[in-house]
């Protein structure tokens, strides 16, 4: 097991982590901004850095080393934008990876579009990210627009149509709540039985849970980041809402902090996610074992798998990009990397299906 003390301290401080390689004149510079305020979040960032380090150890990209710079945006939009500006204009990165939270990725899309820097998303699911029409953004994770359709079909057919909603204020959760309600209306003709808008880091759900209990619902959807979701699940049982009322989670229910914090309250929660550690494919078994050995995570979630797939896609694109890597070629090199990512076709990794991109700046090409 690694000694994480110095690494974690640097991330909490919000500063730079050591680069994956020393500065070189013909290096490929990659900037990364992610939410690293939890143990899992810190390990997502470390895995990305470790994988880039392994690429460098194997000879790099067409003989060029990758200089990776990792920053912690704490899921705060202002910090994410500041990180992006620093990485783009001071570090002069060729490619930006980020962020974890949709509320951070959304404003960064405007920054990268204006600066003409390719941006690839590791975790954010808010559908608006690729609806902005930016020619510079790509998304590896499944868009929230797809989750909503799947969730609503299952819920309406197997749980019931009288659903209450707890919606946290972060952009991904807001999108998940809105999309789920729209899909329940479209597929089953039903309106929400109850909707509660809560803070991103809400700690007290008791009043809402009492009202939901009185409403006699079939299910409760909790759309929130992992820690907030876990608290809501626990308090739903404390309010006396029995297991016959199904709990429905947004995709963050797959994140390790949820069962760790919620304990028995997580039992029976329905959610859709892009990856499961129960996947029996050889590639998934190898990945699960790697994450367990390196990072001590027994059940890797889809944020681990999506970050890993992202690095593999970036590796392919960088190898295919025709770059000069001189002081005067930065603009052209950024465009070449953007075009190489757009050229990715049928990447087969940890996701349940192939990942492809294309040049049109639309959700069809960029999700």
For the regions a protein language model found, what residue spans apply to each?
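Extracytosolic ligand-binding ectodomains
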Residues: 4, 8-11, 24-367
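Sec/Tat signal peptide C-region and signal peptidase I cleavage site
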Residues: 17-25
């Amino acid at each position: 097991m690694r000694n994480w003390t110095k690494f974690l301290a640097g991330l909490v401080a919000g500063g730079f982590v050591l680069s994956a390689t020393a500065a070189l004149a013909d290096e490929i510079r990659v900037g990364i901004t992610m939410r690293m305020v939890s143990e899992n979040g810190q390990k997502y960032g470390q895995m990305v850095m470790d994988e880039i380090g392994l690429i460098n150890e194997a000879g790099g990209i067409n003989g060029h080393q990758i200089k990776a710079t990792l920053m912690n945006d704490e899921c705060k939009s202002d910090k994410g934008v500041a990180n992006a500006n620093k990485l783009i204009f001071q570090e002069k990165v060729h490619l930006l990876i980020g962020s974890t939270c949709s509320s951070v990725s959304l404003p960064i899309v405007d920054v990268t579009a204006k600066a003409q820097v390719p941006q690839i998303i590791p975790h954010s699911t808010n559908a608006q990210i690729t609806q902005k029409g930016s020619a510079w953004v790509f998304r590896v994770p499944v868009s929230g627009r797809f989750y909503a359709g799947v969730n609503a079909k299952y819920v309406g057919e197997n749980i019931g149509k009288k659903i209450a909603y707890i919606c946290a204020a972060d952009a991904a959760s807001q999108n998940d709540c809105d999309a789920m309600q729209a899909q329940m209306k479209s597929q089953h003709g039903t309106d929400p039985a109850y909707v509660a808008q809560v803070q991103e880091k809400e700690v007290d759900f008791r009043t809402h849970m009492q009202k939901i209990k009185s409403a006699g619902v079939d299910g409760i959807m909790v759309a929130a980041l992992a820690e907030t979701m876990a608290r809501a699940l626990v308090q739903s049982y404390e309010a006396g809402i029995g297991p016959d009322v199904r709990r429905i989670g947004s995709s963050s229910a797959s994140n390790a902090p949820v069962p760790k914090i919620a304990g028995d309250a997580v039992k029976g929660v329905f959610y859709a996610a892009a990856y499961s550690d129960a996947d029996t494919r050889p590639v998934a078994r190898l990945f699960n074992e790697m994450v367990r050995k390196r990072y001590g995570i027994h059940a890797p979630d889809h944020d681990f798998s999506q970050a890993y797939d992202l690095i593999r896609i970036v590796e392919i694109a960088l190898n295919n990009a025709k770059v000069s890597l001189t002081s005067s070629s930065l603009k052209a090199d950024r465009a070449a990397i953007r075009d190489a990512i757009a050229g990715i076709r049928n990447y087969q990794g940890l996701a349940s299906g192939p990942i492809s991109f294309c040049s049109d700046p639309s959700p069809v090409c960029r999700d």
